């Protein structure tokens, strides 16, 4: 019962991931960070099968670091999403495909704009202004539809996230143990408290 949320603002992407690691009815870890920093301006949030998620996230991070070392070039969010999608597509054709759903948030430093990508385990990749993965999409997409606008400020995005958190607390029969929220902008990636 993992939840990932993200919304793109004027010059940032605000992300949130549920902080509990749950297996069945048992909470295994109350402070599980479901994100992986890929480089200074790319952040990947992931959910899915427990072993697959961590393994795939570390694999992508290591390969992006290797590319950066070899070519002395940081991948853009779009290039990172394309590479990640290719790896999911290749895995899908194997005997043991990764069962991982992803939100990829990044800031394109050359163009000075934020980008958000939604990827699923079937290697679908879509650029979106806001996104959800997991059961949260049943309740939060309508909130994003209602309140999203392209020129969101960070305060407005935080308010929308709070509305989503309140709706999930009200509707979901599970306690997510809070959310870990991060911002990706021109200054890089930082964690914030909401």
Swiss-Prot record:
GO annotations of cellular component type: cytosol; nuclear envelope; nucleus; proteasome core complex, beta-subunit complex
Q: Which UniProt keywords are given for this protein, alphabetically ordered?
A: Cytoplasm, Nucleus, Proteasome
Q: Which domain of life is it from?
A: Eukaryota
Q: Where would you find this protein in the cell?
A: Cytoplasm; Nucleus
Per its UniProt record, what InterPro entries does this chain match?
Ntn_hydrolases_N, Proteasome_beta2, Proteasome_bsu_CS, Proteasome_sua/b, Proteasome_suB-type
Q: What is its main location?
A: cytoplasm
One of the GO biological process terms = proteasome-mediated ubiquitin-dependent protein catabolic process
- What family is reported? Belongs to the peptidase T1B family.
Oligomeric state and interaction partners are given as: The 26S proteasome consists of a 20S proteasome core and two 19S regulatory subunits. The 20S proteasome core is composed of 28 subunits that are arranged in four stacked rings, resulting in a barrel-shaped structure. The two end rings are each formed by seven alpha subunits, and the two central rings are each formed by seven beta subunits. The catalytic chamber with the active sites is on the inside of the barrel.
State the function annotated in the UniProt record.
Non-catalytic component of the proteasome, a multicatalytic proteinase complex which is characterized by its ability to cleave peptides with Arg, Phe, Tyr, Leu, and Glu adjacent to the leaving group at neutral or slightly basic pH. The proteasome has an ATP-dependent proteolytic activity.
**Protein known as:** Probable proteasome subunit beta type-4
The species this protein belongs to is Schizosaccharomyces pombe (strain 972 / ATCC 24843) (Fission yeast)
């Amino acid at each position: 019962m993992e939840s990932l949320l993200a919304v793109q603002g004027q010059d940032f992407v605000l992300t949130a991931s549920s902080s509990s690691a749950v297996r069945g009815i048992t909470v295994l870890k109350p402070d599980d960070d479901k994100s992986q920093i890929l480089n200074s301006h790319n952040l990947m949030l992931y959910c899915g099968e427990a072993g697959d998620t961590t393994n795939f996230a570390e694999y992508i991070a290591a390969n992006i670091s290797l590319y950066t070392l070899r070519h002395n070039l940081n991948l853009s969010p779009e290039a990172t999403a394309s590479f990640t999608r290719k790896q999911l597509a290749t895995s899908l054709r194997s005997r043991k495909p990764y069962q991982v759903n992803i939100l990829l948030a990044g800031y394109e430093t050359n163009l000075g704009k934020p980008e958000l990508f939604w990827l699923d385990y079937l290697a679908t990749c879509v650029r979106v202004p806001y996104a959800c993965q997991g059961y949260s999409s049943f309740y939060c997409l309508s909130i994003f539809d209602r309140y999203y606008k392209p020129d969101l400020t960070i305060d407005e995005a935080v308010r929308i996230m709070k509305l989503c958190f309140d709706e999930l607390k009200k509707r979901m029969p599970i306690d997510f143990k809070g959310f870990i929220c991060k911002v990706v902008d021109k200054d890089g990636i930082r964690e914030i408290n909401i």
